[in-house]
């Protein structure tokens, strides 16, 4: 596994859950981190290596990708000399992918680029003209004719259509969840246990649309507190706090900050809300359902519509303040039964096996070439 650091985000948590699950099934796992940042505990037994870029030259940004690729090359070669060749390599997050694409020590047939988000929303939405053309060209250079793994079908389709990319092979594998671990952590103490409140869990980033959430909450008529678990830049945090004052809800909005264990807060909440413009998968939706907490989400590009099906689809709102407010009020007053759901498609056991299956497919890739496979 290769990733650009381990800050407190969903993709980072997925990587550690996957690594732990694979090790528990007898596999040797190495995790190469391209930054020192780490907000999560590292699983026991994981070969964890931080590859530091110590360059301080004025032109370091111009040579960053090739320089860091060379450092990664050296680390890969050293690890394989010590423990044998890797059977499978998975690169996570776009900046990591740009570096991994330049690594000559990695076999293209064994290397998969894992897409965690909707690229057009993240990288094209604010661009036009030459900037738009250049970003598309750079992205095509990374993924064209390479193995692509998507956490939802939407993220793969978006990459292919928005950037005109044809992967060598493509596969959909959902994010893994350790149900027992999530439930065990959810029974840790929670300061608001026994109170009615709704919750949002996610970093303070423009795509998460906390502004939409706050306006919808103000319009919903709900008086129970809204707890925000997450962190972001000082600028965004200041703007959000100012918006709560403008909407006259500052006394009901709790800025909890980041916590490595949000599950007690999720379990005791009466409802969890996602207000994003896009979600590659929607980890927190599954985590809430594991904790038997009803959920509301915008009907945004990505994974939420594939997670919230059947009666859960009542929790899907259009991507505007009024629809989100009305849906929040409806689910608050008439929650669906979330105690008897089949969440096995997201189990760590099932997902780990699908990753292991990629090793066999690497040995016989011809039958997958330019074909779409959903696992």
Predicted regions and their residues:
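A conserved mid-protein helix/loop that constitutes part of the nucleotide-sugar donor-binding site
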Residues: 12-17, 196, 200-219, 238-239
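Short His-centered aromatic/hydrophobic patch
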Residues: 91-97, 115
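Membrane-proximal helix-turn-helix segments that form the acceptor-binding/catalytic region
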Residues: 129-148
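Conserved acidic donor-binding segment of nucleotide-sugar-dependent glycosyltransferases
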Residues: 50, 310-322, 329-335
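Short hydrophobic beta-strand element within catalytic cores of glycosyltransferases
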Residues: 294-298
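Aromatic "clamp/platform" in nucleotide-sugar-dependent glycosyltransferases that forms part
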Residues: 258, 277
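A short, active-site helix/loop in glycosyltransferases that binds the activated sugar's phosphate group
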Residues: 144-170, 179
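N-terminal strand-loop element at the rim of the active site
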Residues: 2-8, 13-15, 21-64, 169, ...
């Amino acid at each position: 596994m290769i990733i650009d650091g381990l800050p407190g985000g969903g993709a980072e948590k997925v990587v550690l859950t996957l690594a732990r699950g694979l090790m528990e099934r007898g596999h040797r796992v190495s995790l190469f981190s391209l930054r020192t940042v780490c907000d999560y505990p590292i699983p026991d037994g994981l070969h964890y290596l931080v590859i530091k870029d110590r360059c301080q030259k004025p032109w370091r940004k111009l040579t960053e990708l090739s320089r860091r690729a060379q450092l990664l090359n050296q680390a890969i070669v050293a690890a394989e000399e010590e423990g044998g060749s890797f059977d499978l390599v998975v690169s996570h997050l776009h900046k990591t992918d740009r570096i991994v694409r330049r690594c000559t020590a990695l076999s293209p047939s064994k290397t998969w680029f894992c897409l965690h988000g909707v690229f057009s929303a993240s990288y094209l939405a604010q661009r036009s003209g030459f900037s738009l053309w250049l970003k598309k060209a750079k992205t095509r250079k990374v993924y064209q004719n390479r193995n692509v793994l998507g956490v939802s079908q939407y993220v793969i389709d978006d990459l292919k259509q928005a950037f005109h990319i044809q992967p060598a092979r493509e596969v959909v594998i959902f994010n893994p969840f350790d149900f027992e671990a999530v439930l065990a952590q959810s029974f840790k103490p929670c300061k608001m246990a026994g109170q009615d409140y709704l919750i949002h869990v996610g970093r303070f980033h423009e795509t998460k649309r906390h502004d939409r959430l706050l306006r919808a909450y103000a319009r919903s008529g709900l008086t129970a507190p809204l707890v925000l678990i997450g962190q972001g830049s000082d600028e965004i945090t200041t703007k959000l706090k100012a918006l709560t004052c403008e909407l006259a809800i500052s006394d009901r909005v709790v800025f909890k900050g980041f916590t490595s264990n949000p599950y007690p807060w999720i379990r005791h909440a009466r409802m969890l809300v996602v207000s994003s413009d896009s979600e590659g998968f929607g980890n927190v939706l599954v985590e809430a359902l594991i904790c038997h907490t009803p959920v509301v989400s915008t009907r945004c590009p990505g994974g939420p519509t594939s997670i919230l099906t059947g009666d859960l689809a009542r929790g899907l709102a259009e991507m505007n303040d009024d629809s989100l407010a009305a849906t929040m009020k409806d689910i608050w007053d008439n929650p669906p039964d979330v105690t008897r759901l089949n969440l096995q498609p997201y189990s760590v056991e099932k997902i780990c096996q699908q990753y292991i299956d990629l090793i066999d497919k690497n040995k016989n890739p011809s039958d997958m070439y330019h074909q779409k496979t959903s696992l």
